[in-house]
Each structure stands twice: as C-alpha cells, then as structure tokens.
Amino acid sequence: MDNITHSIKEGCGNPMCNNAYCKSNPEHSSISENEMGDFVVLTAINEYKECCKFITPKQIYSMTPNDVFQLPIEAYLNDNSLKASFRDFPDNCSSRPKGFEYINHQSIFLFMNFLFNVSNPETIKKVFNSISLVQPEQRVLFLCVPYQTKYHNYYGALFKLITENPINKEVIHQFLCQMSPEHLRQVHFLVHSFLDEMFKQGSVQRSNKYPFMIYALRLFKILYEMNIANEFIDYKSFYVYSINIKREWSDDFDLFFKNKEGLLSYSFIIELYTRVLVVHEENRCEQQLTLSGAIQNNFFELFSPYLELRIDRDNLLLSSLNSLVNKRPIDLKKELKIKFIGEVGVDQGGVSKEWFSLIVKELFKVDFGMFTYNNKTRQFWFCSFADDLQDFKLIGIVLGLAIYNNIILDISFPSILYKKLLDIPLTFDDYNILDPEVYNSLMQLKEMSKVDDVSSLQLTFEAVQNYFDENRSYELIPGGRDIIVTNQNLQLYLDRYADFYCTSSVQKQFDAFKQGFRQVVSSPLLLSMRPEELELVICGTKEYDFDALERNAKYKDYTPNSPQIKYFWEIAKSLTLEQKKKLLIFVTSNDRVPVGGLGNLIFFIDRYGDPEKFPTASTCFNALHLPPYENKEIMKEKLLFAIENAVGFGLA
C-alpha cells in the first residue's frame, strides 16, 4: 500500500507511465485526500499494479558493474520499461515524450556494455529472447549492444527483428540520426563485425542460404547512406575484407540479374579491387548469355569474343570514332583488339595500351581545343567553346573501354566530373575543386557581407569567359546584367556562378561525354560507386609501394633469391618517385598504379639478353627482360639508362 500511496502522491517519475492512479501519468485521475484511504485499500485488494521499472541515465552513470549484475534484468526489458528508460526527462514533464525525445544514447551504450560484460550467457540469452516481445519501435535500442564473438549467432536474429518491418526503416533512421559520430561508429562496428565474422566462417558462400545476411546489410545500408550525407567514418570502413573473390558468385549473379535482393545489391561492402573483378565476372556472364543466344539463333559464325578495331594511325580520332560510335553496348564491353592499318603485329595487350595512350594524348592537347588546363590544380575541364560533340562522346567511350580492359588512364579531371557521371548533385563548395582561386575570392565576398554591403562593389549577375583574347559575358539569371549583387541575393549569385562554370556553360560537352561513357558503362556495380572509387578505377592510385610489387612478382630463369633479383629490388626501392614512375612506364607502358595497389599488378622478370646489353621490356606482358649482370653497380647504370631513354627500348 505504501507503493500505491507514493504513486498517487509523488508519482513514479515516468511521464510515460500507464497506471491510471500514478501522478506521473499525464492522464492520471486526481484523488482527494478524503478518498485516498479507501482507494488505496480497494486498489491493493482488487487490482494492484506496480508501476513499470525504468532506469534513468543518472542512475546508470552512478552504477558499478556489480550493481548491474544484481538487477532483475527481465523487469527492465519489457516494452513499457524500455519506453521510459534511458531518457533525461525535464523536471515537471507534463506530456508523454514522442519518439526518442529526451533519449540519452550514452546511457544506453553504457548500460548494454555493463550488461554484456558482467552477465552470464544464460542472462544474455534471455536478453536476446526478450527482444521479440518488445514493440518494433523499441527494438532499435538494442543496436547499442556490444559485439562479442561468442554471441555471434544471436545478432542475426536481432537484425532481423529490427529491420524486418519496412516501416521500421524510418524508426531506425530517426534513432540513429540523434546519435553522435562516436556512437554511430559503435553501431557500425557491431554490424561490420557481424558481417565480417559471417564471411570468415564461410557460412554465406551462397546468399540465399543465409537470410540473416540481408537483414544485417539493410541496416548497414542505412548507416552507409547516413555517412554519405554526414561523414562519421571513412567510407572504406564499410568494406568487409573477408568477402573472398573465390566465393561461389553464381547465386549472387542469379539474384542480381533478376533484380532480387542479394549481396550485390549492397556492393558498397565489397572492397574496390574485388568489386572490379566482380564487374568483369558480371561482364563475362553477360557475354556468355549473348553467345548462348547467338548459338540458339544460328548466328554463332557472326559472333566474336573481341571488340576488333581497325585504326588508321594517320587519322587516329576519326577512324577511332567511326569504329566505335555505332557499336552495341554489349560489344563495347568485349576485350579490345587493335589493328593499326598497314602495320604488322598481333595485339596481345601492348597495341591496345598504345592506342589508349595515343588517343588520350591527342584529345587532351590544349591546342586541340576540347579541354582547358588549370596550371595550379593541374587538371583539365571541358572547354565551353568546343563544338565537336562527337569527340567528347569518343573520350567518354574511351573511359568506359579502359575500365573493361583493365587500362589505367593518364588523365586528370577534378573529382566533380565523377560526381556528375554518377548523377550526384553539386553544391557551391564543389566549385572549390574546379577553381580554388576563384572560389576563395567568392568566399571573401561572403565574409565581406557579414560586415559590409557587397552592393558597393557594383557586381552584377554575370560571368565572363575569355575566348581567343575576347571577353564574353553571360547572364547568370534572366536580366542579370542589370541586377546588382547585394547581401540579400549574394547566395543566389554564388550558387549560379558556381553552377555556370561547373555545369551550365559546359552542359552540351559534358552530356556528349556522359553519353559515350554510359554507352559502355551501365552496370549498377559501377554506377553505385562513390566518386572517389570511380576515379580510382579509371585513373589508379598514387601509392608506389614497391614492397607490394616485389611480393607479387613472377620470375623466369630467376628465383627470388637470385643475386640479380636481389640487386634489382634494392635498386628499384632506392629510386626517386619520378624514376619509379619511369620504371613502370618502361615495363608496363603506364606509370599509374591500378586499383588495389602494385601488389595487384602483374609484373614479370625473366633472364634474357647479354650482360653487355641494356634491359628491355615487353609491355604486352608487363615483362622486364633483365640480363644477368655480375654486380649491382653495373645493373643500376644499365637500368637507369634504359628507363631514362625508354623510347625505342620497349618491345610491344
């Protein structure tokens, strides 16, 4: 009866209490002092209902692990208790909190960590079993549990209970959005650890055999999308490196081609190098389907596994464009074979590499007029005055061909290009990437507007471009020549100015470029990449790790312990960065490092040639022909001369 009296007079402290007589219940029934005695007795006899137990952040912060161990855990894991717990209710709270109002995430994480660290497995099992009895919107609280390998099998069921109701996606998002970056990283660790352990155990070689994977991936995708909007962790932290390229992918592709949910629907968790290999496997499957169709329709004799182009070296661009522009997308994804008209030779990779190199150099010549070059950023951008749109379409096709032929291109675009290719909207701040100098000037205007009136500068809504020493003016908005920039319309001016240079002034050129690129690249596995990832696939990395190159190197008539091989790697690792690039050009015809680093570059060294001769190379096979020099000094002298004078030494 004391408990009932306390509830009536003081309340239990829970604004979400449902007990009709509890003062904390915003909808409680008032009882006068005269009625109190009889009411308490009758309630105690007939319908006594104890107010739900709940735990406040303040209580948690003062707890010790032993206090948690002694708690009647089950009493705190029912639906009503969870609704009230972990909230910092304001004094005299007079209404029921909505959603996750007043929730204190730090207290949830602390409590769950205490619980998992001091409880025995049976108690933890009860905790997991209790989740199914809780209303869906309260289950998200259990995203704050720590990951412990010994409870691995329970987490899959937890993720299922949290995500199986489609309506709950919004609840999950709402709950996570209120978390600090530190707490989001803890939830990320929970889901990532579960997925990593699952793939390590090999229990998901086939996606359709392990449905819990999908529930974890749904949750991980919510975190991934939140991270895109407001980064709380490096995007590479979403990679699950235990996904093995040697896994059985047939079921994954079967689901993928049928637009059904599977691992490839969440390709952001696949490390980039492995994902590129998966893209090639996807293409192989598509080519196989095309071949099967050709056989069934008696067109087999017309089917070629290669994209064969006959190119006139003296008319490189036109012959390349004519050879490519009308090809079917499925044909553009085939392995490229180049035949230069009038020249002897079979393309085993080297001729194609040369074609890519020649066409990129031609198209990116500043005097050719397709692109402008920023000397400070050392990057190219579309020339708004260029009017041969077919050439832009050609370079777009070339970028796509490079992806499917494992060619790293020596091009340098600002990263906004890859955003635009992936249909990611640009912002004013993206202009900083295109032209940092002008961007900083615009930011000075913004700072000026805080203390002064920018209208004093007499700026108008115009942009000026120089065309053959002639300045041409363009209105940023209708009638812009007559509209003065003021503090009130400054942000509009900044946005339109950035949009003009990033988008509207080069819209025709970019659209043609994108059309060519998309003619080759249509796979969701590529188009769902981040801009940084797509840039790496096309342009490679800048990490020249020669230790990784050595670990993956193959030898013929040498061994890793041969004196000449030891000499070579000692020399190679001591080279300057520019010399290392020249060595790569000499052997592979490219100084760019492929996705995954030099450890994923095929690199052969064979014993070939007279010790009096210089080293040579076969760029078709990334092979260095290294004579058996008798000491390191001679080898270094010969090798440096060869790479510094590479033209004429390579045997394509």
Locations of regions flagged by a protein language model:
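Intrinsically disordered, low-complexity, charge-biased terminal/linker regions in eukaryotic proteins
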Residues: E137-V140, Y154-A157
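Long, Ser/Thr/Pro/Gly-rich and/or acidic low-complexity regions in intracellular
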Residues: M1-S132, Y147-K150, G156, K160, ...
